[in-house]
């Protein structure tokens, strides 16, 4: 991976991980570091903004397109990241039922 995925930019996803990859808990420290170091290149390859140069990058693009399963660590981390950001956010409510409108029981439809 020395020649593959080279970039001078660090990758941060402030929309989904505003406190950073390592502080969120979805990724191990090693995975978070890999995303920060090479995520910019991963993203450009995935979006087609950058042409793959090495064989490893060509295989990475094939994984992004769904043509093969992730094998390398970089492929697995990027697949895990994409899965995490595409899933719907879970939220919990304090009540178990449907929201009720106050005063709904008091209303009657009569012409009195």
Curated annotation (Swiss-Prot):
Q: Which residues carry this modification: N6-acetyllysine?
A: 15
Which cysteines link up through disulfide bonds?
none
Upon deletion of the gene, what happens? Answer: Inactivation of the gene affects Ori macrodomain organization and Ori positioning. It removes constraints on DNA mobility in the Ori macrodomain and allows long-range interaction between Ori and Right macrodomains.
Disordered: where is this region? Answer: 91-112
The record's Gene Ontology cellular component field reads: cytosol
Q: Which UniProt keywords apply?
A: Acetylation
Functional note:
Involved in the organization of the Ori region of the chromosome into a macrodomain (MD). It constrains DNA mobility in the Ori macrodomain and limits long-distance DNA interactions with other chromosomal regions. Is part of a system composed of two elements: MaoP, which can act both in cis and in trans, and a cis-acting target sequence called maoS.
Q: Which family does it belong to?
A: Belongs to the MaoP family.
Q: Which NCBIfam families match?
A: PRK11027.1-1, PRK11027.1-2, PRK11027.1-4
Query: What else is on record for this protein?
Result: MaoP belongs to a group of proteins conserved in Enterobacteria that coevolved with the Dam DNA methylase and that includes SeqA, MukBEF and MatP, which are all involved in the control of chromosome conformation and segregation.
What name appears for this protein in its UniProt entry? Answer: Macrodomain Ori protein
Its taxonomic path starts at:
Bacteria, Pseudomonadati, Pseudomonadota, Gammaproteobacteria, Enterobacterales
């Amino acid at each position: 991976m020395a020649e593959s995925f080279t970039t001078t930019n660090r990758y941060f996803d402030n929309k989904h991980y505003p406190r950073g990859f390592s502080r969120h808990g979805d990724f191990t420290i090693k995975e978070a570091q890999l995303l920060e170091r090479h995520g910019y290149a991963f993203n450009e390859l995935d979006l087609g903004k950058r042409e793959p140069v090495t064989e490893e990058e060509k295989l990475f693009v094939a994984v992004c397109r769904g043509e093969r399963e992730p094998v390398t660590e970089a492929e697995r981390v990027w697949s895990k990241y994409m899965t995490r950001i595409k899933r719907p956010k879970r939220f919990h409510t304090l009540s178990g039922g449907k929201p009720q409108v106050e005063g709904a029981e008091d209303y009657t439809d009569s012409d009195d």
